[in-house]
Amino acid sequence: MEYQSPLSRLYHWEREAPDRVFLKQPIDGKWHTWTWKQVAREVRQLAGSLQALGLPKHSHIAMISKNCAHWIICDLAIIMAGHVSIPLHPNQQANCLQEVLQRSESALLFVGKLDNWNEMKAGVPGHIKCISFPFCNNDGCVSWSTFNDEHAPINENIERSATELCSIVYTSGTGGAPKGVMLTFEAFAFVTLNATQHLGLTHRDRFFSYLPLSHIAERMLVEMGSLYLGAQVAFAESLQTFSQNITTSKPTVFLGVHRIWTKFQQGILAKIPQKKLDVMLRVPIISQIVKTKIRKGLGLNGSTLVLTGASPTPQGLLSWFKRIGVTIQESYALTENCCYSNITLKEKIKIGYVGRPFPNCEVRLGPEDEIQVKHKGLMKGYYNEPEKTLEAFTKDGFFRTGDQGFIDEEGFLRITGRIKDLFKTSKGKYVAPSAIEMKFATHSIVEQVCVIGSGMCQPMALVTLSQTGKQMSKEDIRTTAAIMMQQMNDSLAAHEKLGKIIVLEEEWTVDNNLLPPSLKIKRNEIEKRYAVYYDNWELSETEIHFVNNYL
């Protein structure tokens, strides 16, 4: 396909559909809209103000905000001004913010919708100027209007070449310090043009943006997808208004992650208990009414493409949603391959597989069954880390994902684990913890899980409780957990069978450094946090332990 930059697509819609609504954002309960012409005007103005600063070309300019219209406007203005955008996760602590700003060598920081800017701002180095998005009152920042008032907009249609660096996207750091993934304009164009065509998306589609735009999946699907298609994006105002915002927006395309699907399931079961739901689904007429009502309640009644990604979604959860009329299509990709690897199409779904490769994408298995990917959208490398960049690629140019997989005779890929997560028990057998963790997803009392076992006789599962679990008595939890463990052990090999389930009172969050901003688990941090208890737990004859005197 012919190269088309994100800027060229903005100019196209500014010219061809100036009055069509591009962005919709609820502010204080009222919807605000921006047409393509209005977005382009704001982008041109901000780009002019950025150029007036006299920064060297290709300077690194960071953004930190929850999703909103001005996140996209700011991103486009940065690249129009000739610079490189550095999107930062909006839910990080001050020390993490400081680390990424220093690693990225950012010269400027835009600050938008945040819950804890007053705590976070301590991590901003003194030499970095901060500019606030509109509709935000961020202390210590120059206001949007003040920054823009004195400078002329850019009126010409500036272009950026395919090989230029567009953005540095920092990985969430589940296994150590975050790495800056360098992505070119060619990567953004190649992935978006191929993916949207393969998925059959058009300008009539509607996106709903709530997962962080700083994450590559949301950015490619929602920001780049809408930009290349000329489609509409609606935002969620807050967690409290999420349900109202999505039902009002009626998205045709929706991207979820494991945790969101679990929350949706818990919300449905809180209104319709599983036994009652089972009975209703067995009666055809009632079943159809129930399915329609559930989809409408979720805001997915108009959705034709429902995706899940970022981390594996358990088979049981996918099957549960399919049974109630929500067909979820699995996908698989990483930041380093610009969110372009494998996708499940609706007409050919295999539960437990993440589909076949996208067009113009090669996927193969290397040593240790490592999944390796090659296409024109791969990263240039990790910023200022040449050794890690060299390690990330094979000699023939494939990106080494670090994930393990299996490819069946039809070309479908199944993720089986992560090479670095494998541990060896005292019996000398290797265990893939993620495969065991996935089995917990069908049990409604569990919110989070991490399987440990390096050097132990048998693996253990550390779990936190869901709202359903927290409402149960200690003895009921003990009984349910014991049954749950027996059921799982029946399907596991002898060396994989769980010896203990440890019920933790402490939840794992970004604030206590046990979750990264992507909300996966920081396995190493969790293991270190509870390591002092391992010997006592292993020697105990009790199968179900409660920590911190839970309940």
Regions found by a protein language model. Name each.
Residues F22-C68, I72, L76, Q93-Q98, ...:
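Conserved AMP-binding/adenylate-forming core of the ANL superfamily
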Residues D115-A162, I268-G297:
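ANL superfamily adenylate-forming
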Residues L53, L76, M80-T146, Q467:
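Structural core segment of the AMP-binding/adenylate-forming
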Residues T33-K37, C166-T192:
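Conserved AMP-binding A3 loop
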Residues T252-G256, F264-I349, E362, E447:
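Gly/Ser/Thr-rich phosphate-binding loop
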Residues A189-R206, L213-K293, G302:
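Conserved AMP-binding/adenylation subdomain of ANL enzymes
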Residues P18-V21, H151-Y170, A177, G200-R206:
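Conserved pre-ATP/AMP-binding loop-to-beta segment of ANL
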